[in-house]
Amino acid sequence: MTQDRRKICCALWAATSLCMSYAPRPSRGAAAPSRARASGTIEFRDVTKQAGIHFKHNSGAFGKKYLPETMGSGVCVLDYDNDGWQDILFVNSMDWPGHKGATNTYPALYHNNRDGTFTDVTREAGLAVESYGLGCAVADYDNDGFEDIYITTVGSNRLFRNLGNGKFADVTLKAGVADSGFSASAVWFDYDNDGKLDLFVTHYIDWSIAKDQYCTLDNKNKSYCTPQTYKGESSTLFHNKGDGTFENVTKRAGLHDPTSKSLGAAMLDYDNDGWMDLFVANDTEPNKLYRNNHNGTFSDVGVQVGVAFSESGRVRAGMGVDAGDYDSSGWQSLLIGNFTNESMSLYRNDGSGLFVDEEISSGIRQMSLQALTFACFFFDYDLDGRLDIFAANGHVSDDISVVQPTLKYAQPAILFHNSGNRKFEDTSAKVGPALQQPVVGRGAAYLDYDNDGDLDLLITANNGPARLLRNENGNQNDLLRVKLVGTRSNREGIGAKVTLTTSAGARLLRMVKTGSSYASQSELPLTFGLGKPEAGKTVSIEIIWPSGQKDSLSKISADQFITVKEGSGIIAARPIAVGKSTP
């Protein structure tokens, strides 16, 4: 437990609760016409209501202060019907036994109507299934061309197979991935590069209603206990056998660790050896960086590479996490959301096998110090080619202001703009009022729901309404969006690394990934911001697929969405829709 968290949780809370080489001929894709660009200041505008989204998370809280109540829930972005428009899945929890409300609460699948609005199709899709859901991860695990859904829960997790006709079937038991316990985040990735997606699921603590402990703030009322009150619970690794079933290989892979209390997880290739590694954010226990040993096993190198503890050697309360090349070095760095008074962590990968803690030098420490950050991720909201940072914040104790007035339960999100030279600036107040509205933030994801080229935001709130924030005027710069289709690799190219090179020689690295954030997942297509508009701008890209194959494409026009098939080059291209100031 960190000193800062001890001050809050113990002194103040009185021990309470709380990727074969191949080089196809150069391809331009579709010629990109001149765009009538939006102009003006970038604003993230709340369009939730007009988009037809009415999801509200149900924590099931009724006064008993069960710890899972304050942990949910996540959101996932997917194109479940392959129409080229991103859809949304919100994870929901439920009422506790014996305290059932008037209506059932389910996850919510919203179909993109292609006009700025969404329709709730949960029941028609076969997803109206109650569970105490916390997180989700989506991917085409059976390589049939349709994205499937995995939901983490307190209890039995659920795997819903996409039938390809707008409906899903619960195949949890048949697949063997129920994984009972207190699960939070999940990652679909191909750790053995066999072309089939495997599944990693984080577990938090050994908790059940029967094991619930009494913690109090004032010796009168029950409060949420801290994770130190409970034992940890090992995360799980499932190997995809290729026949629709999975095998639990956690112990064989060297990942069994019942001391960890894991919440967020990110897939990355931190050493650029072509094999997927895993980073796991732990709450009040050392973070783990599992290096892939190329033989079906992993080794924890978190301590030796410098990401297990803070710069001062303390454990933190890690929640969400993401990996990305924010300094354009060609190496993936790590971003972690932590507890109040710990600030966010930013570990820069220096390419030598070590990470450097740059939370202070980057400028993110001061502005994130009082925030309790759950979801966090890298994304390029202004398309200047540099990865920015988003953080969703919210405390875990609904009465924290009673014991520490300077802290609030509902907290505003934070948007950090990457100004170059490894520096960030807080621009939350410069992009409109929506991000300044305090919410009990938990999950978050980015997506281009309106296909205008820039990235919009989804934020969930604990026991509150979800929000869709449209990025307005964010597409004033040139860009390229890339979707991958694997052949030897998994169908969606998850784990593929794409390096874009501009005519000026700038190199941008992005990876197709699942998971990251907190209990959530952003869209799979990659977005490359290309900076100021230039007529006839072209770029080249190199793709390193999980199979090891390399595809090189040159003279690709900017301002389009291209689909690249492994070994075949560009198989589809369309111009990016013209951005507008209003939907």
Placement of each model-derived feature along the sequence:
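Beta-propeller blade signature
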Residues: A108-N112, S234-N240, R291, R348, ...
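N-terminal secretory signal peptides and thylakoid transit peptides that target proteins
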Residues: M1-T16
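Hydrophobic beta-strand segments that make up the repeating blades of beta-propeller
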Residues: W85-N92, D144-T153, L199-H203, D277-N282, ...
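Beta-propeller blade termini
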Residues: G72-N82, H111, Y132-F146, R158-R161, ...
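Short, conserved, GDST-rich strand-edge loop motifs in beta-rich repeat architectures
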Residues: V91-N104, I205-Y230, A392-K408
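Blade-edge beta-strand/turn elements of extracellular beta-propeller
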Residues: F44-D46, T117-G126, K167-V177, G244-L255, ...
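Gly/Ser/Thr/Pro-enriched helix-cap/hinge segments flanking short amphipathic alpha-helices
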Residues: E43, A61, I364-Q366, T406-I414, ...
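Repeat-based blade/solenoid architectures
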Residues: I53-G74, A125-A137, G176-V187, K231, ...
